[in-house]
């Protein structure tokens, strides 16, 4: 959704992914939008690989105007059963991955006189919580703090930093979570999620992409350090309340 939105608006893209399948996605965008795209196979948890990815982007396009930090993982497990390896996996991808991306791009942004960073946090951790998601909630809440600190630190140097706080979208990660939750009928798990959303559906990836495109554009030029919730209203209802249907 994010790469599609940026391609639609004419951005030149550096698509970084751990999977070689990213090239297939890139080729579809090239054909549909005539987009200029390079792909880089890299692990966001590896600082050197992210430095190299940013360098390749600058070598190709001359500068980096926007960085979308949207790599993320979620593994479900009761807290007492979650091992340190799983905890560290969340930290490596969800926190260090964003940290490494920011470390890789900010020097270029400073040199060129500014830029935008959009970080994918979540409503989970900072606003709401679910059993079995301790590692995910911890790491996603940390990104809100990182967003605010970077926004303050770089505001006077024309680098804006904002984060999206997504509820549930129909993404591969959510589909994997649904499969873990209900291996026999993952679609039922997704339907159960939608029931709790006032809009009665999950977000479409392109809807999330449009928010990222807005936050990376001059249309949001006075926004920095902001947390933008995109959840179909799922965090609004009270758990216990008296009211009308």
Please give the residue ranges for each predicted region:
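C-terminal helical subdomain
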Residues: 163, 185-219, 223, 230-232
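Canonical Rossmann dinucleotide-binding motif of NAD(H)/NADP(H)-dependent dehydrogenases/reductases
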Residues: 1-14
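Substrate-binding pocket helix/loop in short-chain dehydrogenase/reductase
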Residues: 78-79, 83-91, 189, 193
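Short C-terminal tail/terminal secondary-structure segment
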Residues: 224-245
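Active-site helix of classical SDR
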Residues: 102, 139, 147
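Alpha-helical segment proximal to the catalytic Tyr-Lys
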Residues: 107, 152-156, 221
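Active-site loop-to-helix junction immediately N-terminal to the catalytic Tyr of the SDR YXXXK motif
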Residues: 82, 128-137, 149, 177
């Amino acid at each position: 959704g994010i790469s599609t939105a940026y391609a639609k608006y004419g951005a030149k893209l550096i698509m970084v992914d751990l999977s070689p399948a990213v090239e297939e996605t890139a080729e579809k965008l090239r054909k549909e939008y005539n987009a200029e795209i390079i792909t880089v196979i890299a692990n966001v948890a590896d600082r050197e690989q992210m430095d190299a990815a940013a360098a390749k982007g600058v070598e190709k396009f001359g500068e980096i105007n926007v960085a979308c930090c949207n790599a993320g993982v979620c593994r479900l497990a009761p807290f007492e059963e979650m091992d340190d390896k799983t905890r560290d996996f969340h930290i490596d991808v969800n926190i260090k991955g964003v940290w490494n991306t920011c470390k890789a791009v900010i020097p270029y942004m400073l040199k060129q006189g500014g830029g935008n960073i959009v970080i994918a946090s979540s409503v989970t951790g900072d606003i709401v919580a679910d059993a079995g998601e301790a590692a995910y909630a911890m790491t996603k809440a940390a990104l809100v703090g990182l967003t605010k600190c970077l926004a303050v630190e770089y505001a006077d140097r024309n680098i804006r930093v904002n984060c999206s706080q997504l509820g549930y979208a129909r993404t591969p990660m959510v589909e994997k979570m649904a499969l873990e939750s209900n291996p026999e009928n993952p679609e039922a798990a997704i339907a159960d999620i939608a029931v709790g959303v006032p809009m009665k559906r999950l977000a479409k990836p392109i809807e999330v992409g449009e928010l990222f495109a807005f936050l990376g554009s001059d249309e949001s030029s006075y926004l920095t350090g902001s947390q933008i919730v995109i959840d179909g209203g799922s965090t609004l209802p009270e758990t216990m309340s008296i009211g009308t249907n």
